[in-house]
Amino acid sequence: MAVYTDVSDEALRAFLQEYELGELLSYKGIAEGVENSNFYLHTSTGHYILTLYEKRVSEADLPFFINLMGHLARAGLACPQPVRNRAGTALGRLCGRPAAIVTFLEGVSLSRPNAEHCRALGAALAGLHAAGRDFPMVRENNLSVGAWRPLFAQAEAQADTVAPGLAARTRADLDILEGAWPKDLPGGVIHADLFTDNVFFIGDAVSGLIDFYFACTDAFAYDLAISLNAWCFDADGTFHRDKAGAMLAGYDAVRTLEPAEIAAIPVLARGAAMRFMLTRLVDWLNVPPGALVQPKDPLEYDRRLAFHRTAADARDYGWEG
């Protein structure tokens, strides 16, 4: 989450006239993240999140995201529910951007999750995959393996200014990943961005999953690999095998992983690290001037890739099934 588009008090109050949310009491921009402009809203009826969708999010994809959140919430998953306006729609326009309001979830995100938090996250992710199985809409993952080389082309000329040798390492990894990427794994709706700041806890229990704006249709195990990268490494590249093993076990306890998925964990984890290294690299080199935004360090994922190059099989990720 971030703020790229400033919203005036006058514009927001006019927008809220389209909703039955009572009187606006306060609002505040959310600086975390890098994708959309987000604001906490406090009205006389409660707390909400307002999102203005920025250029990376295609307006054509918004019905998928909005309908998915509604579907998952109805299936019992703790996630934001879109708020419909007086016309019965969940999408509007504010300051020239598509905009939506969703419900606020209680809980806190964890900057240093332990192994039991990772186990709970694995179970919650499996629950998300189960809840989305009968969702009728499909959205291709436009940040999967076929997109990585074009992404790299946007940053290749400057990559070695970020870290010496980064361009050559990336080219070599892409050659391997493009040749080894698995096909025909079990799949359906995935979150595709389930980092620690997109999961809320109350105590040791998951209380909510948020930020579904990369959700798409892809392999379930790839979603798990994204979270392995996000939850089980330190910023310096240190891998915590106990956390990864707990996450895999927590997932498998809810939805049994198939042998092909288990065998694919090393290449999926390597690919997931590549995806986030590349998008971070492009963002790092292209931060809009004046934006209230904190660009993410691409080298955190370059360091994760160094680990993935050494992994032989799922046991290196703590799998004990």
Swiss-Prot record:
Enzyme nomenclature, EC number: 2.7.1.39
Catalytic activity: L-homoserine + ATP = O-phospho-L-homoserine + ADP + H(+)
Gene3D superfamilies: 3.90.1200.10, Phosphorylase Kinase, domain 1
GO molecular function annotation: ATP binding; homoserine kinase activity
Coiled coil ranges: none
Pfam families hit by this protein: APH
Gene name of the encoded protein: thrB
Alphabetical list of InterPro entries matching this protein: Aminoglycoside_PTrfase, Homoserine_kinase_II, Kinase-like_dom_sf, Pseudomonas-type_ThrB
Record key words, sorted: Amino-acid biosynthesis, ATP-binding, Kinase, Nucleotide-binding, Threonine biosynthesis, Transferase
Listed GO biological process terms: threonine biosynthetic process
Name of the featured protein: Homoserine kinase
Pathway info: Amino-acid biosynthesis; L-threonine biosynthesis; L-threonine from L-aspartate: step 4/5
Similarity comment: Belongs to the pseudomonas-type ThrB family.
Aminoacyl-tRNA synthetase recorded as keyword: no
